[in-house]
Amino acid sequence: MITISDAAQAHFVKLLADQPEGTHIRVFVISPGTAQAECGVSYCPPDAVESDDIELEFNGFSAMVDEKSAPFLEEASIDFVTDQLGSQLTLKAPNAKMRKVASDAPLAERVEYVIQSEINPQLASHGGNIMLVEITQEGVAVLQFGGGCNGCSQVDITLKDGIEKQLLDMFPGELSGVSDVTDHQHGAHSYA
């Protein structure tokens, strides 16, 4: 369900050493399955463990997950990264905003899942997003840009070198390309 890197496990063990005995961590999703979903990690003292919690055992501690959050934490990963700027705990949960769709689901559902779980989080750093309008009979994913991507001078590069390449790699033989139907209006909202 959740992968915790060795570095993150060591970090949690160090943090938990300063907590009362029996304290573990809790991994959770607030508003799971919605665009507002947010993931978090907190301390979980023994008296906060619920009877329906799922206990994931790691080296020196356990991660508690509430039953409601569990399906949205499938394929989640926690890492502790150190670089020149310092250290950072990262939690990636690709299914937090929407559940992963089955591999035999209709193409539009699978493409929408990739857009919401992988592409839009990347575009969000620029205040942008895309929406799947349709998939044509020819296999072209028709997209509409929003937010900071609308009117951005880099939208063609983002579309062809980023989004199209990623979608064609993920859906070979099913998608033949992407097209943009956005009426781009450059303004203060545009990223560049």
Curated annotation (Swiss-Prot):
Cofactor binding annotation:
Binds 1 [4Fe-4S] cluster per subunit. The cluster is presumably bound at the interface of two monomers.
What protein name does the entry list?
Answer: Fe/S biogenesis protein NfuA
UniProt entry tagged with the keyword Electron transport: no
Molecular function (GO) terms for this protein are: 4 iron, 4 sulfur cluster binding; iron ion binding
What does the record give as cofactor? [4Fe-4S] cluster
UniProt cross-references to Pfam families, sorted A to Z: Fe-S_biosyn, NifU
Q: Does the keyword 4Fe-4S apply?
A: yes
Transmembrane segments annotated in the record for this chain: none
Task: Show the InterPro entries listed in the entry.
Answer: Fe/S_biogenesis_protein_NfuA, FeS_biogenesis, FSCA_dom_sf, HesB-like_dom_sf, NIF_FeS_clus_asmbl_NifU_C
* Binding of [4Fe-4S] cluster, residues: C149, C152
Keywords of the record, alphabetical order, are: 4Fe-4S, Iron, Iron-sulfur, Metal-binding
Among the GO biological process terms of this entry, one is:
iron-sulfur cluster assembly
Described purpose of this protein according to its UniProt entry: Involved in iron-sulfur cluster biogenesis. Binds a 4Fe-4S cluster, can transfer this cluster to apoproteins, and thereby intervenes in the maturation of Fe/S proteins. Could also act as a scaffold/chaperone for damaged Fe/S proteins.
The family line of this record is:
Belongs to the NfuA family.
Record's signal peptide: none
Q: How does it assemble?
A: Homodimer.
